[in-house]
Each structure stands twice: as structure tokens, then as C-alpha cells.
């Protein structure tokens, strides 16, 4: 008899989990509260560890074709005037697989690829629908949906983001925590000669430039923002210009052209810090619902797809769903907390606004940045599922 799963949330984690479990023979129902596909970020970049997991899902080649690949893994650091500081290179080999080191892609394109696989795999997708309540027995879950249906399943996944309805129902004390940072993003036409991932540094500010297709790139800037800051959408262009006006060089043209018709997004960055166990009975949280992070390591999407791949592998190896869920938390919690901690540290370092302190940070980065990249990804690989496969659930 086929096992059934209800997945709440059709972001990266939810879509990838639906694909992974459908490929493993599960009957999958995916519900999403939005009535149409909408995306809270114009662009995203995925490093090689995330692309290795997309390969495991069978979607990596389509992702690379839909985005912009940085084939040599180069990340160019510039000062606020656009003068070179140093470069780092990201790895293109994970768990024995050669992958693109860095991929930039529009969120809409990523979801187009994923939704195509959902359709081909026969996943039932219900938009404009969410979970109203959850009841559990020892070996099953029953969920009342907002469309009036009562759905029984073997497993329920809360992949419904930072403000997770599933988490609110079962873990009401776990609330998103404001990080102190805001992220400003904008989409622009890509000049033919701009093919690198660029990070520009100034005291208390970072501004990145990342190609996301042959035709487009996006800017992403981080800055300390007040708690509970809210800005009217019509002010976003002016505010982004004013916050990052110190940046010239390759960023100047893009900042100067911002206006009312620009594609812009402002996000107050929040984290989710769950207890070590991400499940209660047959209900499990994945993705941002369980471990939303600050963006400074660029690992949010990669951690979401890795959740999906690891969960499917664990469930493939046993008929004991409860034991697989316990093992999932044991494997994934340390890796995701490592990413959260590393990202937070990078953010705090970059937020230092004293010019002399900033200069000292840059001096240290010139000699240590590549080693830190290498150490981070080596540790991430050590914490990955492939290094735990000898243990059975």
C-alpha cells in the first residue's frame, strides 16, 4: 500500500520534498496558501552543495539551463568605489559529483522547473489552501484544510516558511526572531560583459551583484534596519538608492536607474531557531519553517533542497516512519545550525560601521577569505547526510 504525505507550503522545500517523495512512490498532496505562484525574492544564487542535491532530484541540468552559471566559482570583492580587493573561489565538487560552483536564477524560473516535475509526477497541488487544524493517532495524521477537506495521511510536512502555520499549531512558542538586518533587492538588465558574482564592501554595508540569466542580474544589499521597520512600496526605490549611495563602480548605473517601475523587494530578515527535534509524531518541519537563516552564506535554498533529499533517502531505507523522522532531526539539525551560526557571524562582521574597524576586517579577509570558504564547505560536507549513511534509521 502506498504511503501518503501532505506537504504544506510550495516553496523550495515543499516542492523539492514533493518531487523526492513522489519519485519514491509516495502519494503526495501539496497545498499552498497563495492563490497563485508568487515569489518573495526576485533572484537567488545556489552554491555547489545545493546543486548536488538538485542533481539527486533529477532537476539540476534544467536549473543550470534556466539560470546563469559561474563556471569557475569566482566571487569578486570590490570596495565601495569599485576597486578590486580580493577574490575567492567556491568549490565545484561535492560528494564525488562535479557541479556548477555558483548558479544565479530567478525564483520564478526555479519554480517553473520544479512545478513541471510536480505535474509529470502526478503530485496533487491545491493553491489557495492551507491547514486549519491537525490531529494525530499513533501512526497517522488527519488535517482539516481550509477548503473543507479532511485529509488523512501517514506523514505531514510543514514546509510553509518563516511564518509557518504548521509550526504555529504544534510549536506555538517558537517564533521568528528579527536579525537586525534588512535586505534590499532589485532586478536589472545585464550588460554583456558582467558575468561574475560581485560583492562590494563599505563600512556597515554590503552590496552584491549576481547574474540570474543571460539577460538579467539582481542587486542585493544588506544593512542594519530598525526593529519593526516598515516602508511603503512606493518608497523602496528612493530608500534603496539612499542606503547604498556610497557604492559606485559597477553598481552605480543600477542604483541610479532605480525608479517607480523597477522590480524591487525589501525584506526584514528573520531567523527561526527550533529545538533539536523538528517533529511531533508524524508531523515534521523542513526548510525555513524549521531553520530560516540570515542570507550571508547564501545557503537558504541549498538547505531546503537538502532537507528534501535527506528525508526521502531516510524514508526509503525503512518502513519505520517515526524512526526515520528521529534520524532526520539528528542529521539535519547540526548542519542547519552550523549554517545559521556562520551566516550570523558574517552579518555581524559586515555590519561594523567604524571605518578603521572595517579596514581591519578587509585586511584580515585578504589573507583568510579563501581558507574560510574552504573550511566552511569542508565542514558542511562533513555534516552532510552522505557521511552518515553507514548508520541505519
Write out the residue ranges for each language-model feature:
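Conserved mid-domain beta->alpha element of the FAD-binding
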Residues: 6-27, 31-34, 157-158, 240, ...
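C-terminal helical "tail/cap" subdomain of flavin- and related membrane-associated enzymes
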Residues: 1-3, 65, 75-77, 81-82, ...
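Active-site substrate-recognition segment that forms the wall
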Residues: 196-229, 233, 237, 241-249, ...
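Catalytic P-loop NTPase motifs of RecA-like helicase/translocase cores
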Residues: 37-38, 165-166, 292-294
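A short coil-to-beta-strand element that immediately follows conserved catalytic motifs
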Residues: 176-179, 194-196, 249-267
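Conserved N-terminal helical subregion
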Residues: 1-5, 22, 49-190, 228-237, ...
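Histidine-centered metal-chelating micro-motifs
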Residues: 163-164, 183-185, 205-208, 290-291
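Conserved N-terminal glycine-rich FAD pyrophosphate-binding loop of Rossmann-like flavoproteins
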Residues: 36-52
Amino acid at each position: 500500500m502506498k504511503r501518503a504525505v501532505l506537504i504544506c507550503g510550495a516553496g523550495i522545500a515543499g516542492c523539492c520534498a514533493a518531487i523526492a517523495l513522489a519519485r519514491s512512490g509516495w502519494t503526495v498532496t501539496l497545498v499552498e496558501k497563495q492563490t497563485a505562484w508568487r515569489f518573495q525574492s526576485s533572484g537567488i544564487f545556489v552554491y555547489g552543495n545545493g546543486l548536488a542535491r538538485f542533481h539527486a532530484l533529477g532537476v539540476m541540468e534544467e536549473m543550470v539551463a534556466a539560470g546563469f552559471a559561474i563556471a569557475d566559482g569566482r566571487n569578486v570583492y570590490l570596495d565601495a568605489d569599485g576597486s578590486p580587493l580580493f577574490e575567492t573561489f567556491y568549490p565545484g565538487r561535492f560528494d564525488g559529483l562535479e557541479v556548477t560552483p555558483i548558479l544565479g536564477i530567478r525564483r520564478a524560473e526555479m519554480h517553473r522547473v520544479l512545478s513541471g516535475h510536480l505535474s509529470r509526477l502526478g503530485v496533487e497541488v491545491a493553491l489557495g489552501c492551507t491547514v486549519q487544524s491537525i490531529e494525530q493517532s499513533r501512526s497517522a495524521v488527519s488535517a482539516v484544510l481550509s477548503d473543507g477537506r479532511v485529509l488523512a495521511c501517514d506523514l505531514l510536512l510543514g514546509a510553509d516558511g518563516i511564518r509557518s502555520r504548521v509550526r504555529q499549531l504544534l510549536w506555538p512558542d517558537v517564533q521568528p526572531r528579527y536579525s537586525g538586518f534588512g535586505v534590499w533587492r532589485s532586478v536589472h538588465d545585464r550588460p554583456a560583459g558582467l558575468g561574475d558574482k560581485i560583492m562590494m564592501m563599505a563600512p556597515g554595508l554590503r552590496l552584491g551583484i549576481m547574474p540570474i540569466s543571460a539577460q538579467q542580474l539582481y542587486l542585493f544589499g544588506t544593512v542594519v534596519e530598525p526593529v519593526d521597520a516598515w516602508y511603503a512600496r512606493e518608497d523602496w526605490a528612493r530608500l534603496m538608492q539612499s542606503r547604498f549611495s556610497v557604492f559606485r563602480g559597477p553598481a552605480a548605473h543600477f542604483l541610479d536607474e532605480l525608479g517607480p517601475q523597477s522590480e524591487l523587494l525589501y525584506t526584514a530578515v528573520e531567523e527561526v531557531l527550533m529545538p533539536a527535534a523538528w517533529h511531533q509524531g508524524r508531523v515534521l518541519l523542513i526548510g525555513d519553517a524549521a531553520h530560516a537563516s540570515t542570507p550571508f552564506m547564501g545557503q537558504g535554498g541549498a538547505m531546503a533542497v537538502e532537507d528534501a533529499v535527506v528525508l526521502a533517502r531516510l524514508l526509503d531505507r525503512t518502513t519505520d516512519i517515526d524512526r526515520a523522522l528521529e534520524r532526520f532531526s539528528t542529521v539535519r539539525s547540526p548542519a542547519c545550525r552550523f549554517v545559521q551560526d556562520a551566516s550570523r557571524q558574517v552579518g555581524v562582521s559586515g555590519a561594523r560601521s567604524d571605518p578603521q574597524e572595517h579596514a581591519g576586517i578587509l585586511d584580515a579577509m585578504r589573507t583568510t577569505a579563501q581558507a574560510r570558504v574552504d573550511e566552511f564547505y569542508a565542514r558542511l560536507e562533513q555534516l552532510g547526510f552522505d557521511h552518515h549513511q553507514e548508520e541505519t534509521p
